[in-house]
């Protein structure tokens, strides 16, 4: 029988009509002469009714089915009895009185219940991902992701962009994260790399005259495992010739506005606010500021530089900073023990301690209160502090202070429920530094990437004798509720400027040519001024769906150890495959996928 409609689309307009439905048994209830089955498909659930007196044959089959059996049913849509109406279900006013039923597939007992709020470990859910995706919450996420992707294609097509695919097998040009490399059988000892982004190819498309490009690009980064990072992800990738930052931002805002309206039902106001990178770091302690709440950071360096608290005075004398946040009403909410936990946590950012005072009617209470008697009035005025507030101080370098207070600000706001739900605060962070110092690599790197154009007034910093690390770039990140969802820039189209930027990053001419020669050559052959932006589809969909994890909006994700439990990837390959690739190992390697490689 041909299906007439999805189970979840059954409605009051079909009352009295015969329907054919196909789906899974979500729940079954036997009330003696009546059996009720909740039939599920991707659009939702409808209640089936089997009446022993009216149709004993169908009743007998229904009596034998179990959860997750696949059924085909034919029956008539009818209104539920008044007391049986379920206002929480889309189909809650109707049910289907079944005339015929056929079991299309049976199911063993599943390893966990196929319901929202399932009590199962994430790895177990991922091992049986095809079952996990049957849960209504997960199917909603998949549908939302599909709808967003559809809007993206439609929007950029209407804006005159061309959907152009770029290679997935390309040359290794690692910048920051490691490449995933693919050995060549045809050329032993040579390797392709999976793209970390289509960056260089989309610039070459501008050189080709494509003018406006976009694609939903698959990207791969062999990064250290932490948080919600995924080794493979999807980004909405765009590039425009002859464009200013404002042009690119306006087009991007148009997409966001449409997605928010159609997906969330919210009409966001454009243009979005713009915030300088320096302001974001100074006031929010983050280059992805969360503007849904206050508790801004205040610089108290000038106020405490002459205090009797030597830690503060010496920090300022060394050219560093003393900054603080005020927790409204925090004096009664946080004990010394609570504050000590935060102090331990911020040590990971390089902070040596967390000073604090509680504001009282007579001044301050706390470990450093006696050292700040002469500064109480100034500090209170600067921070608008009132009796009952808690003030937290961090002293140190710019990044130590910013990172520490930025973390504290967000953690405390979440703990005290200061963030209103259903707020959608988009903004642009602009005017980034061109370069930043990477403590891990022990060298200067590009804050975005080496192909970002500097501000015109900062080009002189690339000349000999100047300090290039003072330069700022024509770059911009799009932020949503304290999450970076994308970033972009105007690109360098002048080969001389590109050579100087690579030199500032420590590239010799030979190394630059070996790694980026194809791009450097393209810059000499009529490269137009151009720029673009890419933002992560996965993270954006996670925020739109208000999901707990990015893994909840990816059909088949990797876990936090970069393992896919469903297929047990990564896996070993045969000796023959290794021989074909001319690959051999110096020693036997036998990793277990349930352990971290570093622990084996």
UniProtKB/Swiss-Prot annotation:
Q: Which CDD domains match?
A: AspRS_core, EcAspRS_like_N
Annotated region (Aspartate), positions in chain = 199-202
The UniProt entry, under Pfam families, shows: GAD, tRNA-synt_2, tRNA_anti-codon
Gene Ontology terms, MF aspect? aspartate-tRNA ligase activity; ATP binding; catalytic activity, acting on a protein; nucleic acid binding; transferase activity
Q: What Gene Ontology terms for biological process does this UniProt record contain?
A: aspartyl-tRNA aminoacylation
For this chain, the annotated S-S bridges are: none
The UniProt annotation places ATP binding at 221-223, 230, 484, 536-539
Q: Give the matching PROSITE patterns.
A: AA_TRNA_LIGASE_II
GO terms for cellular component: cytoplasm
| Name of the top EC class for this enzyme | ligase
EC number(s) from the headed UniProt entry:
6.1.1.12
Tell me if Aminoacyl-tRNA synthetase is a UniProt keyword of this record.
Answer: yes
List ligand-binding residues for L-aspartate.
175, 221, 448, 491
Catalytic activity entry: tRNA(Asp) + L-aspartate + ATP = L-aspartyl-tRNA(Asp) + AMP + diphosphate
Q: Where in the cell is it found?
A: Cytoplasm
The lineage's top-level taxon is: Bacteria
Q: Mind listing the UniProt keywords for this protein, alphabetically?
A: Aminoacyl-tRNA synthetase, ATP-binding, Cytoplasm, Ligase, Nucleotide-binding, Protein biosynthesis
- Where is this protein chiefly located? cytoplasm
Assembly? Homodimer.
Q: Supply the NCBIfam families for this chain.
A: aspS_bact (TIGR00459), PRK00476.1 (NF001750)
Q: Record's family?
A: Belongs to the class-II aminoacyl-tRNA synthetase family. Type 1 subfamily.
Report the protein's function. Answer: Catalyzes the attachment of L-aspartate to tRNA(Asp) in a two-step reaction: L-aspartate is first activated by ATP to form Asp-AMP and then transferred to the acceptor end of tRNA(Asp).
Protein's name according to its UniProt entry = Aspartate--tRNA ligase
